[in-house]
């Protein structure tokens, strides 16, 4: 029987950094106002680089670290809500950029849950026995879709990409998962396609940008997401104290504090990096995972149990427990 495992990680963020003090120069806000409410201190902003450029850097780094060729890849999945274009897909652009001629490639759209949804999908592809190796990447350039005059959203988001190499193995590494969607609450967090106009229909300016009902999303995260994490642990062969780290979507530090209390888990087991990157949507979890490996928290030697949980637009939320 075939299984899948995460064998390598990588991440990339644009060089340009915008601090809270920088934002205070262009809108009515302050470092204290932003950081006390979100934990965010700065974010990386793409200037000339596109979503596929960021994802390509991650893909090349994964190949280099793994010492494999692009020709060894069977598939590439990119989770994003900020694609370069509707077609070709961001994943197709990455496939061309790295020369992975044998790989099929497609995008997956599930907002801040995108990486978890994509990783679950990729695990099924490899476990089927039909494929051996694939890249799963979360990549976003959210700076291009936020309204920079709206301090309620503009201060939250940043650009970046992260990803993993998934490979076939004879041992089970994916231990449990739960994925959910509630489209009836979808209007709580929206992002429309900018620049699309028709002589038969007009688009209002306020429909062109990312919008969010912050209170609704906060309540959703601490209620539904926390319960989903509990349910996933119960569906696994593990107890909560057997999980080494909880890598959650980096939306807001207060959300992480609330979830930690609901799970009765020490915050030391819930790493955070939103202070450096802000909310990078589908990229947040793989960036965090890659940084945890760099810092030596996660070993990539098959000895640790890691919980990954994403939540966001759709509304969508999903949790995976994996051996890494």
Curated annotation (Swiss-Prot):
It catalyses: malonyl-[ACP] + acetyl-CoA + H(+) = 3-oxobutanoyl-[ACP] + CO2 + CoA. One of its GO terms (biological process) is fatty acid biosynthetic process. The keyword Phosphoprotein does not apply. Catalyzes the condensation reaction of fatty acid synthesis by the addition to an acyl acceptor of two carbons from malonyl-ACP. Catalyzes the first condensation reaction which initiates fatty acid synthesis and may therefore play a role in governing the total rate of fatty acid production. Possesses both acetoacetyl-ACP synthase and acetyl transacylase activities. Its substrate specificity determines the biosynthesis of branched-chain and/or straight-chain of fatty acids. Belongs to the thiolase-like superfamily. FabH family. GO terms for molecular function: 3-oxoacyl-[acyl-carrier-protein] synthase activity; beta-ketoacyl-acyl-carrier-protein synthase III activity. InterPro entries: ACP_syn_III_C, ACP_syn_III_N, FabH, Thiolase-like. Its main location: cytoplasm. One of its GO terms (cellular component) is cytoplasm. The active site is at 112, 249, 279. The keyword Hydrolase does not apply. Residues 250-254 are annotated as: ACP-binding. Its EC number is 2.3.1.180. Pathway: Lipid metabolism; fatty acid biosynthesis. This is Beta-ketoacyl-[acyl-carrier-protein] synthase III. It comes from the Bacteria. Keywords: Acyltransferase, Cytoplasm, Fatty acid biosynthesis, Fatty acid metabolism, Lipid biosynthesis, Lipid metabolism, Multifunctional enzyme, Transferase. Homodimer. CDD domains: KAS_III. Pfam families: ACP_syn_III (PF08545), ACP_syn_III_C (PF08541). It is found in: Cytoplasm.
């Amino acid at each position: 029987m075939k299984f899948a495992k995460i064998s390598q990680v990588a991440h990339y963020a644009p060089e340009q950094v915008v601090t809270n003090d920088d934002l205070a120069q262009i809108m009515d806000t302050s470092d204290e106002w932003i950081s006390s409410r979100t934990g965010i201190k700065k974010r990386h902003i793409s200037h000339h680089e596109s979503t596929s450029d960021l994802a390509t850097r991650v893909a090349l780094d994964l190949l280099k670290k793994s010492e494999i060729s692009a020709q060894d890849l069977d598939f590439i999945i990119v989770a994003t809500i900020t694609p370069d274009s509707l077609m070709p897909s961001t994943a197709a652009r990455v496939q061309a950029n790295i020369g992975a001629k044998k790989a099929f490639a497609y995008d997956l759209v599930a907002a801040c849950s995108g990486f978890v949804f994509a990783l679950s999908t990729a695990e099924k592809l490899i476990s089927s026995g039909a494929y051996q190796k694939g890249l799963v990447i979360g990549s976003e350039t959210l700076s291009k879709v936020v309204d920079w005059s709206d301090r309620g959203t503009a201060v939250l988001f940043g650009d970046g990409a992260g990803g993993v190499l998934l490979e076939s193995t004879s041992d089970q590494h994916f231990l449990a998962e739960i994925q959910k969607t509630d489209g009836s609450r979808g209007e709580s967090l929206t992002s429309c396609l900018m620049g699309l106009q028709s002589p038969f229909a007009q688009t209002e300016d306020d429909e062109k940008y990312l919008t969010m009902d912050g209170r609704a999303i906060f309540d959703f995260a601490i209620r539904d997401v926390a319960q989903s994490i509990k349910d996933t642990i119960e569906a696994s062969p593990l107890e909560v104290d057997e999980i080494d780290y909880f890598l959650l979507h980096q939306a807001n530090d207060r959300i992480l504090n609330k979830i930690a209390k609901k799970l009765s888990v020490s915050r030391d087991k819930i790493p955070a990096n939103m202070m450096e990157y802000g909310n990078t949507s589908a990229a947040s979890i793989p960036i965090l995972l890659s940084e945890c490996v760099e810092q030596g928290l996660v070993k990539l030697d098959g000895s640790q149990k890691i919980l990954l949980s994403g939540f966001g637009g759709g509304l969508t939320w999903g949790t995976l427990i994996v051996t890494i």
